[in-house]
Amino acid sequence: SRSKYSGLRVNRETAMILAMRVALYEGSWEKYHKGTDFATEDNSEEFFKEVMNWGDQYLFPAGLTLHMTATNPKATNIDDAFSELFNSNDLSNISEVTFWKKYSIADGVFNTVTQQLSGGVTDNVKPSGLSKSLVDNFLNVDGTPVDPTDEKYKDFNEVFKDRDGRLLAMVMHTGCKFKSNSLMNVRVYDETGTEAEQKEKNKDISSPRLNGDGIYKNVTGFHTRLGIDTTYVTGNCETAHVMCRYAEGLLCYAEAAAELGQYNDNVAEKTLKPLRQRAGVVYVTPAADPHFPFQGLPPA
């Protein structure tokens, strides 16, 4: 079990969540490829039911819990509990993480996650960055979808106001640290005065690595925050690597229920409501988003 080995070995809970993911994938594949060479028959309903059976019979009774801000003594902001899943060295006491990898510099097992991210690297091959469409997928705190065509979002800082806490945890924004001594600050550039005066007046601006070179350059303006240890100064890192979480099982269950036409308040209470509560987002019944790029798919 997860509790026996603190999530450091493959365990029953992780196997359950993996089974749910596989069944959801296969069911979705057969349903949406029905009648093509990729799916000669459609047993999707059977697979979706299997996902829910795994949830009802095994996952929910397993005693796993989401890592919440309210129960985290170190949390001060709404996004802190979610962030802690990805920027901590030790996840032994966080039951939401059912399977993870531990690093120890003393034992010669380490990574360079914060070292890379703090320098602007998210891809070791070429310059990169998180997409605007990903950022737009995060809800407002009142549970409504964002209107990406709103002119106010031309201001970088407006993008993060009154938004899902997971967006704040995932994307670098004003006030975030790249590492212990590197604070990000974005504001409108003051173009008045001479070149020297402009340089002096704007020296407090620290962009999300837009001015980097090669793989150290961010090309979208949205830089990954998850995985950054803000106590990092230099050298190698011990940031833990999450491989499976309880939240994944909740999402699988909710999606399978929606595919079966069985998504209701009871399902929401067990799945999406607690996830959104942690993110500081008011739960509202899923509805069609007029700006959703994949029109035709169910909203839940």
Where are these regions (language model features)?
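C-terminal substrate/ligand-recognition segments
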Residues: F160-Q277
